[in-house]
Amino acid sequence: MKPRIVYRPLHGILLLDKPSGLSSNNALQAARRLLRAEKGGHTGSLDPLATGLLPLCFGEATKIAGLLLGSAKAYDAEIVLGVTTDTDDADGESLRERAVPDLSEADLQAALAPFIGRIQQQAPIYSALKQGGEPLYAKARRGERIEAPVREVDVQAIEVLGYGAPRLRLRVTCGSGTYIRSLARDLGEALGCGAHIASLRRLWVEPFRAPQMITLEALSAVLEAGAEAQTLLLPIEAGLADFARIVLDQTRAARFRMGQRLRDAAFPTGQVAVFGPDGTPSGLGLVDADGRLSPQRLFNGLNEIPAC
């Protein structure tokens, strides 16, 4: 009988290099078991086919997971022109094959131009978006007729990395909610031949622009070699780099952590990251135009050292 895993409180962010073939939740649970972390969450799903950066939040860091979900991201995508699939990627069943037209670099740039900026995009029917409280992919697997939602997304840049028919390599920088599978599908239709994603890798997620990622295999190896789990996590403040910062003295930090509002004309307005005098993050707050700081999310237990 396998020994029961004893979980412990860990607080911080792991920059996981997700492998292909694993769902984001399964990747999270695998990392959580290796770290023996009590609580964990990810910051937005990567398709099972995709590899690359999946920030995982543990303990008190789960309180900022939703904020990272809305961050800008960048991907490298390999697209196969001429074949459409039911999932819009290589994991799906082929639906239709069409001839790929001769395409110059100018043709590709002209075809890509309408997909840059704020655009309307229909999500894939095989996606984790929920409809009636159920993921679309569950309905699709049952063969139900689905009208996937159309949403406005922000595609900031598309760079052509290479093209040799039928394979096109792109680097895409985009905002939250953008489906690269949908981008490939719609680009294929614009070219008159259809397309799907052959491979996809997420390069970075704001604010982790140059991430030092770790694979599940490497994580397992360093833990087996005796590394302390907490030392493998980035501190919570690493995920707060894009927020205005307020440092409070000990008395006001204690009041903030008790949920009390504070007022100071010098506070920057908007959402802020609040720290105590020793640099430990106390939480997130919102400062109004009158300098009133209201607590939004409070971090607890960050100075506690977990048992090994």
From Swiss-Prot:
<dbReference type="GO" id="GO:0160148">
    <property type="term" value="F:tRNA pseudouridine(55) synthase activity"/>
</dbReference>
<dbReference type="InterPro" id="IPR032819">
    <property type="entry name" value="TruB_C"/>
</dbReference>
<dbReference type="GO" id="GO:0031119">
    <property type="term" value="P:tRNA pseudouridine synthesis"/>
</dbReference>
<dbReference type="Pfam" id="PF09157">
    <property type="entry name" value="TruB-C_2"/>
</dbReference>
<comment type="function">
    <text>Responsible for synthesis of pseudouridine from uracil-55 in the psi GC loop of transfer RNAs.</text>
</comment>
<dbReference type="GO" id="GO:1990481">
    <property type="term" value="P:mRNA pseudouridine synthesis"/>
</dbReference>
<dbReference type="InterPro" id="IPR002501">
    <property type="entry name" value="PsdUridine_synth_N"/>
</dbReference>
<dbReference type="InterPro" id="IPR015240">
    <property type="entry name" value="tRNA_sdUridine_synth_fam1_C"/>
</dbReference>
<dbReference type="Pfam" id="PF01509">
    <property type="entry name" value="TruB_N"/>
</dbReference>
<protein>
    <recommendedName>
        <fullName>tRNA pseudouridine synthase B</fullName>
        <ecNumber>5.4.99.25</ecNumber>
    </recommendedName>
</protein>
<feature type="active site" description="Nucleophile">
    <location>
        <position position="47"/>
    </location>
</feature>
<dbReference type="InterPro" id="IPR014780">
    <property type="entry name" value="tRNA_psdUridine_synth_TruB"/>
</dbReference>
<keyword id="KW-0819">tRNA processing</keyword>
<comment type="similarity">
    <text>Belongs to the pseudouridine synthase TruB family. Type 1 subfamily.</text>
</comment>
<dbReference type="InterPro" id="IPR036974">
    <property type="entry name" value="PUA_sf"/>
</dbReference>
<dbReference type="InterPro" id="IPR020103">
    <property type="entry name" value="PsdUridine_synth_cat_dom_sf"/>
</dbReference>
<dbReference type="Pfam" id="PF16198">
    <property type="entry name" value="TruB_C_2"/>
</dbReference>
<dbReference type="GO" id="GO:0003723">
    <property type="term" value="F:RNA binding"/>
</dbReference>
<dbReference type="InterPro" id="IPR015947">
    <property type="entry name" value="PUA-like_sf"/>
</dbReference>
<keyword id="KW-0413">Isomerase</keyword>
